[in-house]
């Protein structure tokens, strides 16, 4: 005689006589700890601490059945959980891939000893879209193989990806801004919230998509740090779906890991400046380079003029020395000539005196 699991909000199943005091719990919140689950199940006197977050073992089969009856479909940490008796895995030797089919095309699901039957109660059928936690419709009685019901935990990788990342209290992320967006546009968009820092960048996914899909409009990502932390949620609520440069943008709190990644990249590529980091354009860089070249040219021209003056001065001194006697200055020579002329005029001619 098979052991019947008590009625649950979803369906009734029958185990094939294998008694188990362990229950399987699915759809727990990813942040649930062992301590929280133990407190949740405390009144049912679990025999051991629940290992992981999927199984809990109790002192008896009756107690485990009571847990299934009371807690299947209950809310725990704002999520509906699904509880059923644990069924140990027993390999049947069937091939992993492919299933044998009957002549009518229906799948042959194994021996009767390995089947579990849905309840035959049809007086109050469930709605057509109601399904159990394994995705099997419960409105029509049918047989299913135990192996078709997954009892293992969800892959660790999926759980790790769904774990919430730490979010910033003052920085907003925009992932779909128009490619031509510049610092001035972003500051104008957030002017009522006094943005203190703006980063505009293109992520790896955006670069990859724009290389492969030429018709797709190019986009950039934006990080905006606000002056006050309390303005974060208000800015997201009021500006979300508003247009920035003609495109509706979607805002959310930035991940701290993304902020750190962008800031480190900016430190490597940015030119030191006292002003907040902005996006440098090719025109600005060309203008700055042109100014530096002009300054260097002016300096060289002044040096050339100074050298030319020095050379001209030395050349002039050399010419004057070659023309003028070296021992008598020019002024003294002129004075001697003048005195000689005066002497000749003042002395009488000797021939005239004799006569």
Curated annotation (Swiss-Prot):
InterPro entries: Nucleotide-bd_a/b_plait_sf (IPR012677), RBD_domain_sf (IPR035979), RRM_dom (IPR000504), Rrt5_RRM1 (IPR034244), Rrt5_RRM2 (IPR034247), RRT5_SRSF_SR (IPR050374). One of its GO terms (cellular component) is ribonucleoprotein complex. Keywords: Repeat, RNA-binding, Transcription, Transcription regulation. The keyword RNA-binding applies. Residues 21-88, 170-256 form the RRM domain. One of its GO terms (molecular function) is mRNA binding. Residues 314-324 have a biased composition (Basic and acidic residues). Gene3D superfamilies: 3.30.70.330. This is Regulator of rDNA transcription protein 5. It comes from Debaryomyces hansenii (strain ATCC 36239 / CBS 767 / BCRC 21394 / JCM 1990 / NBRC 0083 / IGC 2968).
């Amino acid at each position: 005689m098979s052991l019947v699991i008590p009625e649950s909000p979803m369906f009734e199943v029958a185990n094939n006589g294998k008694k188990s005091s362990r229950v399987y719990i699915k759809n727990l919140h990813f942040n649930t700890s062992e301590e929280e689950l133990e407190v949740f199940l405390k009144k049912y006197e679990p025999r051991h601490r629940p290992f992981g977050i999927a199984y809990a073992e109790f002192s008896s089969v009756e107690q485990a059945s009571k847990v299934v009856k009371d807690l299947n479909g209950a809310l725990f940490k704002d999520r509906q959980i699904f509880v059923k008796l644990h069924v140990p895995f027993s390999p049947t030797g069937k091939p992993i891939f492919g299933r044998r089919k009957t002549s009518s095309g229906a799948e042959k699901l194994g021996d009767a000893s390995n089947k579990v039957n849905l309840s035959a109660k049809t007086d109050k059928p469930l709605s057509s879209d109601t399904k159990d936690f394994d995705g099997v419709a419960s409105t029509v009685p049918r047989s299913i193989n135990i192996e078709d019901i997954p009892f293992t935990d969800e892959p660790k990788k999926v759980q790790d990806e769904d774990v919430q990342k730490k979010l910033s209290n003052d920085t907003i992320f925009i992932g779909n801004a128009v490619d031509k967006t510049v610092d001035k546009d972003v500051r104008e968009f957030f002017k009522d919230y006094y943005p203190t820092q703006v980063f505009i960048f293109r992520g790896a996914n955006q670069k990859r998509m724009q290389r492969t899909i030429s018709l797709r409009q190019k986009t950039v990502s934006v990080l905006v740090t606000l002056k006050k932390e309390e303005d974060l949620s208000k800015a997201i609520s009021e500006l979300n779906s508003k247009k920035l440069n003609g495109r509706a943008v979607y805002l959310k709190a930035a991940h701290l890991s993304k902020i750190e990644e962008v800031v480190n990249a900016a430190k490597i590529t940015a030119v030191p400046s006292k002003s907040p980091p902005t996006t440098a354009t090719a025109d600005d860089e060309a203008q700055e380079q042109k100014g530096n070249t002009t300054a260097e040219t002016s300096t060289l021209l002044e040096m050339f003029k100074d050298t030319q003056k020095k050379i001209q001065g030395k050349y002039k001194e050399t010419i004057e020395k070659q023309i003028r006697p070296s021992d008598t200055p020019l002024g003294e020579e002129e004075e001697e000539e003048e005195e000689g002329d005066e002497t000749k005029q003042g002395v009488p001619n000797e021939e005239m005196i004799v006569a």
